[in-house]
């Protein structure tokens, strides 16, 4: 079979895996309330808002997912070199990373909540721990497995010269950064502050004054994940999937058109710059259109 067709198929599969991983990563952070929005959850009891959110800001998402995917990639790489099937090796590595993820989540939830119990009266809800840890580990496993699979495809079928553990680390940091900057806005700026008028941002005076009641009953992290699965999660997946797909596409295009290595590299760089320029132009057009259409925010 034509090597170009194999590369295109591997790129399509890697892009699809990256899309799933981005969505799962964002929804996992919504269930556990990690990254930027967690500062508001942490401030809640200090503002008198006793809540039932799962409070587990282990670290920023880029650092934590860099760790999880690097663990999975390293174990998978070792098992593949030992002769195990690649898919099984990735599953085993992702399973170990899920255990690490769960251990950090439990310790972070208990530690951060107990630290606020005596002074601010925030209880440690054990049912919140037991009901949330499953979705956290489950979403995390899906995210880590698909990211490790995309990294494996990059190192085998797409010609990435770096070893699997290093590519997995880079992919983990990347998806964590995208989830923190893209999907978490839907959770932190909207879901946590639905009692305030939409579009007003989060003034300093409102920080920590989060919603503690849901449409029915008391709100928790599972409610946040359900809400964000309709926009924030898919948007994060689309963003990460496009990054992986377009980055691989420019390299394949350079290999098809170019002759020597310098020409291939130059074409790939030019296509990459063109993609960035087009994306920036579309973003600018959308922002200007939205501002002209809806005008400035008014309370």
UniProtKB/Swiss-Prot annotation:
Keyword Membrane: yes
Pfam families registered for this protein in UniProt: MtrE
Pathway note: One-carbon metabolism; methanogenesis from CO(2); methyl-coenzyme M from 5,10-methylene-5,6,7,8-tetrahydromethanopterin: step 2/2
EC number annotated for this UniProt entry: 7.2.1.4
Transmembrane segments: 57-79, 95-115, 133-153, 158-178, 237-257, 262-282
UniProt keyword Cell inner membrane present: no
GO terms, biological process: methanogenesis, from carbon dioxide; methylation; one-carbon metabolic process
Domain of life: Archaea
Keywords: Cell membrane, Membrane, Methanogenesis, Methyltransferase, One-carbon metabolism, Transferase, Translocase, Transmembrane, Transmembrane helix
Compartments, as annotated in UniProt: Cell membrane
GO molecular function, one term: tetrahydromethanopterin S-methyltransferase activity
UniProt membrane topology term: Multi-pass membrane protein
NCBIfam families xref list: mtrE (TIGR01113)
Function: Part of a complex that catalyzes the formation of methyl-coenzyme M and tetrahydromethanopterin from coenzyme M and methyl-tetrahydromethanopterin. This is an energy-conserving, sodium-ion translocating step.
Subunit organization: The complex is composed of 8 subunits; MtrA, MtrB, MtrC, MtrD, MtrE, MtrF, MtrG and MtrH.
Family: Belongs to the MtrE family.
Name by which UniProt lists this protein: Tetrahydromethanopterin S-methyltransferase subunit E
